[in-house]
């Protein structure tokens, strides 16, 4: 297996089955972050992930981390918090602010480069990338964003400035996603946070089968229209 150099003149990707085992899932480098190339990548289970100063790197890890939304793990403490939550949750109200929050909230640095920000803003303008916002009064305290593929949602990043804000974003999104025909959330690579919320690892081949099937299944009409998803308990 060898790393493939992408051409700027073609948006085609090599098969994910050719990805390196170490580092796990590294498939290709180069190309660009145009909407057409990004959408082609997501349609084939591939995503960009690289640090500032590095070339664009494309990944398709094996195994793949996913969350079946009905399997979201609601801990006792989170259930108590949610029952008296002070938060309001919205959909697609403030995409730019959410991606800024994901970029700037990590003290150790971030993989979300200026180029990544601009690329996903373009995807949002085209109706493919979406945000979930969590508010305390008028303050944005958390959120997440990702890319839609029919009944599958590819989560990209989340942030939290207040207690349980990012968990609230995912909890409320899972409930709405299920209600409107959503089936699976792609978490890309498992970490302790997503594992605590119910994410698991499945073989890449299984993920690609789910992706091929689910991206052909539309959600209920107008699901992504900007709106309020959750109001705080009184």
Swiss-Prot record:
Subcellular locations according to the entry: Cytoplasm
Keyword Cytoplasm carried by entry: yes
Key words, A-Z: Acyltransferase, Cytoplasm, Transferase
Reactions it catalyzes: N-terminal L-lysyl-[protein] + L-leucyl-tRNA(Leu) = N-terminal L-leucyl-L-lysyl-[protein] + tRNA(Leu) + H(+); N-terminal L-arginyl-[protein] + L-leucyl-tRNA(Leu) = N-terminal L-leucyl-L-arginyl-[protein] + tRNA(Leu) + H(+); L-phenylalanyl-tRNA(Phe) + an N-terminal L-alpha-aminoacyl-[protein] = an N-terminal L-phenylalanyl-L-alpha-aminoacyl-[protein] + tRNA(Phe)
First-tier enzyme category under EC: transferase
Keyword Acyltransferase in record: yes
GO cellular component: cytoplasm
Coiled-coil residue windows: none
Gene Ontology biological process terms, A to Z: protein catabolic process
GO molecular function annotation: leucyl-tRNA--protein transferase activity
Enzyme Commission (EC) number: 2.3.2.6
Pfam family, one: Leu_Phe_trans
Family: Belongs to the L/F-transferase family.
PANTHER family tied to this protein: LEUCYL/PHENYLALANYL-TRNA--PROTEIN TRANSFERASE, LEUCYL_PHENYLALANYL-TRNA--PROTEIN TRANSFERASE
Function text: Functions in the N-end rule pathway of protein degradation where it conjugates Leu, Phe and, less efficiently, Met from aminoacyl-tRNAs to the N-termini of proteins containing an N-terminal arginine or lysine.
Protein name: Leucyl/phenylalanyl-tRNA--protein transferase
Species name: Salmonella arizonae (strain ATCC BAA-731 / CDC346-86 / RSK2980)
Lineage, highest ranks first: Bacteria, Pseudomonadati, Pseudomonadota, Gammaproteobacteria, Enterobacterales
């Amino acid at each position: 297996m060898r790393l493939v150099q992408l051409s700027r003149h073609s948006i085609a990707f090599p098969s994910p089955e050719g990805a390196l085992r170490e580092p796990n899932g590294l498939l290709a480098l180069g190309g660009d972050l145009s909407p057409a190339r990004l959408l082609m990548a997501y349609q084939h289970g591939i995503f960009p992930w690289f640090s500032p100063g590095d070339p664009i790197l494309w990944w398709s890890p094996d195994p793949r981390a996913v969350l079946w939304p009905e399997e979201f793990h609601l801990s006792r403490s989170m259930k108590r918090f949610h029952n008296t939550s002070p938060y309001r949750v919205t959909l697609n109200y403030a995409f730019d602010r959410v991606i800024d929050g994901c970029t700037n909230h990590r003290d150790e640095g971030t993989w979300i480069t200026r180029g990544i920000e601009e690329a996903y803003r373009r995807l949002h303008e085209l109706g493919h990338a979406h945000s979930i916002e969590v508010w305390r009064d008028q303050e944005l305290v958390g959120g997440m964003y990702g890319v839609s593929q029919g009944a599958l949602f590819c989560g990209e990043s989340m942030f939290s400035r207040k207690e349980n804000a990012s968990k609230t974003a995912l909890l409320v999104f899972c409930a709405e996603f299920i209600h409107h025909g959503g089936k699976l959330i792609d978490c890309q690579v498992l970490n302790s946070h997503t594992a605590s919320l119910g994410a698991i690892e499945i073989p890449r081949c299984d993920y690609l089968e789910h992706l091929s099937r689910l991206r052909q299944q539309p959600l209920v009409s107008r699901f992504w229209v900007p709106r309020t998803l959750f109001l705080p308990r009184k």
